[in-house]
């Protein structure tokens, strides 16, 4: 029984599903998808639970959420192993994900008060108040690259605001989704407040098509986000938050410490086997001898990166991709770029058949026309050379995406120029593209999102503002508007 609906674990009535470790092939999870009727059942449960949950005080809802944080802490080792084994991540990185989940609780509570709490301003004849109210029933679609942390970034603020939820994890990470749901169960969430439906495309389509849905919060690929946007078009009454991918540029300008710049680039491009939406996909490198030296050093260090299994000791820098198919897609993308005229500097290699262990790849595309503006979700870095900083900014903005952008340079003036001209929601200076502050919004523009950034700003899309003018008594104004006559004279 792998679905959690209205406080009960039940068996899915849809297609059967088996999840294997993408490196070892070990069977980790077996179950069945939710069919359309079970998705509707989950929605009815969430709708029935909404009035009571929304009427609880914030303090009462916060108690449950903080209890969940405590369970994350006490089950950290177990959840770390589940996420690592299911995604192919290494133990060290999965542990940082669980830590991020724990930290998200306090951050979300603070963000609720700062961004969507209550405010009151006294006026001569009363007061003006601002309150926030939950939307109702929200669907949360989780991604596979951070199956605990990223859905958590939607679920926690949505619950704090008083919403009820139907959560569909990625079909590639059902075990992680179930493990997190069982912790919420232990935390004492009332039945129907959070419901878990497992499944792939058919389950997702049934969920997004629900008429009695007040909104949808999505993290994933741009193509899926676009489909959801089209599906919900003409329904302005529903909140839609889309956090999608990017074709992110990293500009390497003048470099004082080549090894430091190489380290930053590897952290930007190859961490999590290149499976972060903010990863650098395009390296824009200044022409000249210094750029040549940097590129040679980047290739030399990157070719030492050997991916390994989640529990290998000593721990490698990168693990496997989410699946053998995902790894093969990266290899295919590299082959296509090479066929277009790209110059391979470091060829990506599958270490073993039927596994997702893939070494990083680097290919130079300078002067090649018609390179697709697409996100290759894996450890493949494309390189372009530029002559002037103005040209670098034009190249950086030459994408339909707009998630992250970075600059390596000692010159503050160039960063200030980039801040003015970059089209990206995250713009970093001498910091990895994959770094983000928990007290800042997380999201992009263009094909990277629909102006609903998450993280610190997630509270914004989990509640709607209600403005009030208030007075505890009603009296006739001392001064009336022209044309109003409240005298006792009888009009003849």
Swiss-Prot record:
Cysteine disulfide partners in this protein: none
Gene Ontology biological process terms in this record: arginine catabolic process to glutamate; arginine catabolic process to succinate
Active site (catalytic residues): 243, 277
Pathway(s) annotated for this protein in UniProt: Amino-acid degradation; L-arginine degradation via AST pathway; L-glutamate and succinate from L-arginine: step 4/5
E.C. number: 1.2.1.71
Top-level lineage group: Bacteria
Catalytic activity: N-succinyl-L-glutamate 5-semialdehyde + NAD(+) + H2O = N-succinyl-L-glutamate + NADH + 2 H(+)
InterPro entries assigned: Ald_DH/histidinol_DH, Ald_DH_C, Ald_DH_CS_CYS, Ald_DH_CS_GLU, Ald_DH_N, Aldehyde_DH_dom, SuccinylGlu_semiald_DH_AstD
Keyword Ribonucleoprotein: no
Protein keywords: Arginine metabolism, NAD, Oxidoreductase
A Pfam family matched in the record: Aldedh
Molecular functions per Gene Ontology: succinylglutamate-semialdehyde dehydrogenase activity
Keyword presence, NAD: yes
Binding residues for NAD(+): 220-225
Family, similarity comment: Belongs to the aldehyde dehydrogenase family. AstD subfamily.
Function: Catalyzes the NAD-dependent reduction of succinylglutamate semialdehyde into succinylglutamate.
Name this polypeptide is given: N-succinylglutamate 5-semialdehyde dehydrogenase
Source organism per UniProt: Shigella boydii serotype 4 (strain Sb227)
Gene that this sequence comes from: astD
């Amino acid at each position: 029984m792998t679905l959690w609906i209205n406080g009960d674990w039940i068996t899915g009535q849809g297609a059967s599903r088996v999840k294997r470790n993408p490196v070892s092939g070990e069977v980790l999870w077996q179950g069945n998808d939710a069919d359309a009727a079970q998705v509707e059942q989950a929605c009815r449960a969430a709708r029935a639970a909404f009035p009571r949950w929304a009427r609880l005080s914030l303090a009462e809802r916060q108690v449950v959420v903080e209890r969940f944080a405590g369970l994350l802490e006490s089950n950290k080792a177990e959840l770390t192993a589940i996420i690592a084994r299911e995604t192919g991540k290494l133990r060290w990185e999965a542990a940082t994900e669980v830590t991020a989940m724990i930290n998200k609780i306090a951050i979300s509570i603070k963000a609720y008060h700062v961004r969507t709490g209550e405010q009151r301003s006294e006026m001569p004849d009363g007061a003006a108040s601002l309150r926030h109210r939950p939307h109702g029933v929200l669907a949360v679609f989780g991604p596979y690259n951070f199956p605990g942390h990223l859905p958590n970034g939607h679920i926690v603020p949505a619950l704090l605001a008083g919403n009820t939820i139907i959560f569909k994890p990625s079909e590639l990470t059902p075990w992680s989704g179930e493990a997190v749901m069982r912790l919420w169960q232990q935390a004492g969430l009332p039945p129907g407040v959070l419901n878990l439906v497992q499944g792939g495309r058919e389950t997702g389509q049934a969920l997004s098509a629900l008429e009695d849905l007040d909104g949808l919060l999505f993290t994933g690929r741009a193509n899926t986000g676009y489909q959801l946007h089209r599906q919900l078009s003409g329904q302005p009454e529903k909140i839609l938050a889309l956090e999608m991918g990017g074709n992110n540029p990293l500009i390497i300008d003048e470099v004082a410490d080549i090894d430091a710049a190489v380290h930053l680039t590897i952290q930007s491009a190859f961490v999590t086997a290149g499976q972060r939406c903010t990863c650098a996909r395009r390296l824009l490198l200044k022409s000249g001898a210094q750029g040549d030296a940097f590129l040679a050093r980047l290739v030399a260090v990157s070719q030492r990166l050997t991916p390994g299994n989640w529990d290998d000791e000593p721990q490698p820098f990168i693990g496997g991709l989410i699946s053998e198919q995902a790894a093969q897609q990266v290899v295919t993308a590299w082959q296509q770029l090479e066929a277009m005229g790209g110059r391979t500097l470091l060829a990506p290699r599958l270490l073993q058949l039927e596994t997702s262990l893939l070494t990083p790849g680097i290919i130079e595309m300078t002067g090649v026309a018609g390179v697709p503006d697409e996100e290759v979700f894996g450890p493949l870095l494309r390189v372009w050379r530029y002559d002037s900083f103005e040209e670098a900014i034009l190249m950086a903005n030459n994408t339909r995406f707009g998630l992250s952008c970075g600059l390596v340079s000692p010159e503050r003036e160039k960063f200030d120029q980039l801040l003015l001209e970059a089209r990206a929601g995250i713009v970093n200076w001498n910091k990895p593209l994959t770094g983000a502050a928990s007290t800042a919004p997380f999201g992009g523009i263009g094909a990277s999102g629909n102006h609903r950034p998450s993280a610190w700003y997630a509270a914004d899309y989990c509640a709607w503002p209600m403005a009030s003018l208030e007075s505890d008594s009603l009296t006739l104004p001392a001064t009336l508007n022209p044309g109003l006559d409240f005298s006792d004279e009888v009009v003849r």
